Amino acid sequence: MKFAVIREDINPVRDGIARALVQKCLDHGHEVSTPENGIRFVLNLTDSEHPRIFRRNAQNIFIFSLITASSSVKDLRALCYTTLVRTLSNVVVCAVPGNGGAPFGPSDRTEVYFTTPEAGFYHLAFDPETVYERLIPIAGSHFAIGNAFSLDLPQRYWEPSAVVDKIRDYGRELDRLGVLPAPFPLREVLSEESIQDIYRLFEMKGLSYGNLSARERIPELGPATFWMTARGINKAKVSKVGRDVLLVKGFDYYKGQALVSVPPDHDPKARVSVDAVEHELIYRTFPEVGAVVHVHAWLDGVLCTTQNFPCGTIELAESVMNLLRQTDDPSRTAVGLKNHGLTITGPSLDDIFNRIRGRLRTEVEMMS
């Protein structure tokens, strides 16, 4: 893969880590290039006080921002996540030199902290190969978050069905359970131009976490039709078909697009949740699955993915499918998404919530 390195200032620790990481990329056959020359990722060397934004022109260019911080920072997680948002990054890698660390480069006492948009936050001792192994799979992943709309939703579904009513009710319950983190206050740290840039690039009209879906068999639209909450909405306020909840009738994997059936009065800015690719794979592969819930919470003893793939990528969807196949009953189970949350399947939303009520841990377990 081709990549670019962007830097405006000098920081000995950060730049030493960057040199080691660039060399590791070169050792593995990657090529340093320029942003206009078909790159797949950018190493953005910046700082938390004056963060630099690299404005990508495509979804599948991944931004890895490198910063440093003192071990005396009171809330390192908040600092890193704010920097992640302000730099529009896929990952922030923050180096924290330990006491006695080398003043002009990374030492064996330097810790690196990884922060992702899914609220992942974990750390490990600095090692170029280990950092490379955490980042490169992300750079090689592929978003599948597009939507292709058809005005073919049967009229009997223009108003919420019993299945949509269940999604509405359980969206409210998720909100009460506290497993839908509050959206990051983007306007406190980003210009309106940057916010609109994010929304345009990732086809969003807001930021939110978690999602619900439930199967509703509509034979004239396809064999695996299901309702799913829309992208960026308040899950506690699901009400309108074509705006808050959308009917997915299939997926075009070549184009990376969910095939969405809508009523005539749909919101043209509405988009189904970025996890639609994962849910569609589940419904198509396991006919017994009637509902899927994704929450930023944890359950003890679940199988877990080994790589932090971004939400909405084919690679994350395939990782979840591989885990489901390893469980005793893929149609009624829960699997973990590393440093992210859970995907929970069941024959119905009623069944899922009866199983998880009182068992969810609201703090996601972080793993390096």
Locate the predicted segments by residue:
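Long, non-catalytic terminal segments
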Residues: 1-273, 360-368
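A short, acidic, amphipathic alpha-helical segment used as a generic capping/interface helix at domain edges
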Residues: 316-331
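Small/polar glycine-rich anion-binding or flexible loop at a beta-alpha turn
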Residues: 298-302, 335-343
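Flexible, glycine/charged-enriched surface loops at secondary-structure junctions
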Residues: 328-336, 366-368
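Active-site beta-strand/loop microenvironment that shapes enzyme catalytic pockets
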Residues: 52-56, 64-66, 71-75, 268-318
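A residue-level signal for conserved active-site and pocket-lining positions in enzyme catalytic cores
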Residues: 214, 282, 340
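Divalent-metal (often Zn2+) His-rich catalytic cores of metallo-beta-lactamase-fold enzymes
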Residues: 344-357
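A structural signal for short, well-ordered beta-strand segments and their strand-loop junctions
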Residues: 227, 292-294, 336
